[in-house]
Amino acid sequence: MDIKDTLRFIRELWFFSILRDDELAELISKAEMRSYKAGEIIFNQGDKGDSFYIVYSGKIRVLRKDKNQAEINLGVMTRGDHFGETALISDKVRNATTRAAEDSILIAIGKEAFNKYIFSKP
């Protein structure tokens, strides 16, 4: 996947509309494309938050354990959906587990870049 495709995809997402083109290009240069196989965990409930994720392709299931440790399905994320920002903003642990429901590619933005380019904007 080349930078132009990634830039075009990210530019279409509403929460990146606040960024100038140069800021968006710099943010993308700091982002990582990560591949996950079906069934693979992206992060677990209780993990420390270190990245914000955007679904580029595939499906990601969001799960939470109840008080009896049974998994509750909270939903499915698809292309263009994002997740993981709550733990970055609140500086708390992840409140859910995310697992690839099928082979998926995610764009991962680390905490430092997230705070600089997204969270600090009005």
Sequence positions of predicted segments:
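Short, structured motif recognition centered on aromatic/hydrophobic residues
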Residues: 6, 15, 52, 106-107
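Regulatory nucleotide-sensing modules
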Residues: 11-63
